[in-house]
Design a protein with these regions (language model features):
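N-terminal helix-cap/turn-to-beta initiation motif at the start of protein domains
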Residues: 12-27, 109-123
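Large eukaryotic, non-enzymatic subunits of multiprotein complexes that serve as scaffolds/tethers
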Residues: 1-13, 96-97
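Extracellular beta-propeller repeat domains
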Residues: 44, 55, 72-84, 92-95, ...
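Contiguous, well-ordered beta-strand patches that form the walls/edges
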Residues: 51-80, 151-199
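Surface-exposed beta-loop interaction hotspot
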Residues: 88-130
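Helix-rich interaction surfaces within compact, conserved domain-sized segments
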Residues: 85-105, 199-200, 204-216, 220
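N-terminal glycine/threonine-rich, aromatic-flanked beta-hairpin/loop signature
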Residues: 29-60, 130-163
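Short, hydrophobic/aromatic-rich segments at coil-to-beta transitions
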Residues: 22-29, 44-48, 62-69, 119-125, ...
Length: 234
């Protein structure tokens, strides 16, 4: 197991989900409270974003009509829910935008994705491969404890943010250092994971401070016998 490049897309190869092309050719208008954004998917690997122009993109599908999209290489991502006509944009200079998706002749949905504390007090082991996993403890609304195999005895405390996407589906955003010896190359320091707690599956990406291509992530979760002291807010 290691890093594989498929059409110049780095990913952890063992449990890597295939890239999704279902958004190719579509143009989406995302409506935030004070602004509109446009995402035009030129093809499977290229889109035009109204905020930054044309950029490379990669798309992973987590569930029916639910997609995780990377935009360029600077920690810009979108979670697109076509079923509920909702979207979340994360942009390094502008933060989060919780949006509705325009559709001709239809009113905008009243609900939006939102920040949540529903994960607080929970923890799981997320498996990227048979020998590579991350244990994560969501002990407060803005912090998590994380460890990587093989050094799973050492938990570090990192800034985190949790967004509710659907019932039991969340976007987890962690600013984390990768320890030496991990399968993730050094330099990747921001991790997005779109997590389904019913199916215990996830998709996402890691972004690098060195402006390298996003590292696509996917796999499955499982419960783990975590030390109760890890859940304390100290």
């Amino acid at each position: 197991m290691g890093i594989v490049f498929d059409d110049r897309t780095p990913a952890i190869d063992q449990y890597s989900f295939p890239l999704c092309s279902e958004l190719s050719g579509r143009e989406l208008i995302l409506v935030a409270p004070k602004k509109k954004y446009t995402l035009k998917f030129e093809d499977d690997t290229l889109l035009t974003f109204s905020e930054s122009g044309t950029a490379g993109c990669r798309c992973l599908k987590l569930a029916d009509q639910l997609y995780f999209v990377t935009i360029g290489q600077n920690s810009t991502v979108a979670v697109i829910d076509l079923k509920e006509r909702l979207a979340t944009l994360v942009m390094p200079d502008m933060g989060y935008a919780f949006c509705a998706i325009e559709q001709d002749w239809k009113a905008l949905p009243e609900t939006r994705h939102c920040e949540t504390d529903e994960l607080v007090g929970t923890g799981l082991r997320w498996n990227f491969g048979s020998e590579f996993y991350s244990k994560q403890v969501y002990f407060s609304v803005d912090r998590c404890r994380m460890t990587w195999s093989p050094e799973n005895y050492r938990f570090d405390n990192f800034p985190a943010r949790y967004t509710r996407i659907r019932e039991k589906v969340y976007l987890v955003d962690i600013n984390a250092r990768v320890p030496a010896g991990s399968y993730v190359p050094r330099g990747y320091d921001r991790f997005f994971m779109l997590q389904d707690y019913d199916k215990l599956l996830f998709v996402g990406a890691a972004f690098s401070i060195d402006d390298a291509a996003p590292l696509m992530l996917s796999g499955f979760g499982e419960t783990d016998d975590l030390d109760p002291t890890l859940f304390g807010d100290d």
